[in-house]
Amino acid sequence: MAKQIIFGEKVRVSLKKGVDTLANTVRVTLGPKGHPVALERKWGAPTVIDDGVTIARDIELPDAFENMGAQLVKEAATRTSDAAGDGTTTSIVLAQAIINEAFKNIAAGAEPINLKRGIEKAVAALKAQLRKNSTPVKGKQQIVQVATITGKDPEIGNLIADVMDKVGKDGVITIEESRGLRYETSYVEGMQFDRGYISAYFVTDPGRMESVMEDATILMTDRKIETVAELLPALEKILQISKNLVIVAENVEAEALATLVVNKLRGNLNILAVKAPGYGDRQKAMLEDMAILTGGHVISKEAGRKLDSVTEADLGHARRIVSNKDKTTIIDGEGSAEAIKDRIKQIKAQIEETESAFDREKLQERQAALVGGVAVIAVGAATETEMKERKARVEDALAATRAAIEEGILPGGGTGLLNALPCLDALKLEGDEATGVNIVRKALIEPVRWIATNAGKDGNVIVDKVKNSPVGHGYNAENDVFGDMAEMGIIDPTMVVRSALENAASIANMVLITDSLVADIQEKAPAAPGPEAAGMY
């Protein structure tokens, strides 16, 4: 296909238009008084949502060059969401501010590479300062505060805190849709392991890049499956029993994987293939744990069994299995409670006997997986649109809470970034590198400015007041007051703030040093033939 190419100033104009279109759409959601955005759906009612990354993912622009700018900023939000689960809108706002200010300086003669170096040095100093300013999460009340701010609902904050209190900070928590009208929590047998789907073609929820299997039948083996010949006899037997199959194997590759993917895409099979966790003897033990939890048996090389020997009794069962690229969660396995208790006792005995600290740690992880179970938060609402919006907020709140526990917290509402600003004064740079630092300095006020603007206030006035306030003091947009953000319960996870800044700067740097764009020339579809004239054949 023929290409169209643009250079220089035209590149910056197109990229800026794309960046601004996406950022202007998303930034209205920032803060407690931000406004939701309605997303059109091919079928049914539009989705009304205030989650930055979900909105960004839905945006495609008709102009190819402008769309490149939008997609690059979308990448900043996606990376932030993957790393911290929240802060996606902040990341987009920061990226837009850095890009627009950098383009002004490039138009005035600044060298993009030197601006990039200055921006990188400023961000490195800010990240170190953010970690220095961070404080650990103390007690259940701060967990409530973090989850409430991200979920924009005190009920969500209390819900997350209660569930974490029961399953522990590292416990497995899953979020499901419910037919009810409110939030419900339950605790079921289950486990999670750090292996995801083998191929992205198994994804059933493209928005979250997850494969979800309801009423799953599970085939577990420590074998590597490579050919259709070894897989087909087992599949024919299993599909007479269940249409929802999850294969957990050492690996599924080559011809066997291609066959599963093709049949999945054609709708012939509802299937998910996942790599077995661990290696060697530990893999065998973890597969055995899984078999006991789900009421099945492992098709094991040691026992001399092949896949074609599988019987109905070998298959495990679970109410639900959720898998992404990194981990898989088995929820409500149908294994015998007595068998699970016996397995836990066996692992406890091994923990007491082992002299290896490493082995003890791995055994304790296995024990925790069997003992802890899985907490399930079921999200209900009066309509499907409201339910999906609520579910997204609960997911964000859970991710932000985990981030806060991992890296600590900072004053919220954009105050954490403003408090870190003085560290930039110590950077003694010259020329365009110093300009790069000033670009970041100007960008850091934008989150506070937009939180205030979305609350109906003059953003610049609010920024000036926050800058002149004591460290840790900021603007509470919910109640329209200034004060100590921590005391008011307005806190942000350090990981969220750091990731938002880091990813915004990274994407902005890519945009500002780009000097040519290449895109396909879209061929116009041929016009439909008109009706034939009367009397002609």
From Swiss-Prot:
Keywords: ATP-binding, Chaperone, Cytoplasm, Isomerase, Nucleotide-binding. It catalyses: ATP + H2O + a folded polypeptide = ADP + phosphate + an unfolded polypeptide. Signal peptide: none annotated. The keyword Isomerase applies. ATP binds at T29, L30, G31, P32, D86, G87, T88, T89, T90, G413, D492. Pfam families: Cpn60_TCP1. The keyword Nucleotide-binding applies. Its main location: cytoplasm. Its EC number is 5.6.1.7. It is found in: Cytoplasm. GO terms for molecular function: ATP binding; ATP-dependent protein folding chaperone; isomerase activity; unfolded protein binding. SUPFAM superfamilies: GroEL apical domain-like, GroEL equatorial domain-like, GroEL-intermediate domain like. GO terms for cellular component: cytoplasm. GO terms for biological process: protein refolding. InterPro entries: Chaperonin_Cpn60_CS (IPR018370), Cpn60/GroEL (IPR001844), Cpn60/GroEL/TCP-1 (IPR002423), GroEL-like_apical_dom_sf (IPR027409), GROEL-like_equatorial_sf (IPR027413), TCP-1-like_intermed_sf (IPR027410). It is an enzyme of class 5 (isomerase). Together with its co-chaperonin GroES, plays an essential role in assisting protein folding. The GroEL-GroES system forms a nano-cage that allows encapsulation of the non-native substrate proteins and provides a physical environment optimized to promote and accelerate protein folding. Belongs to the chaperonin (HSP60) family. Forms a cylinder of 14 subunits composed of two heptameric rings stacked back-to-back. Interacts with the co-chaperonin GroES. This is Chaperonin GroEL. It comes from Dehalococcoides mccartyi (strain CBDB1).
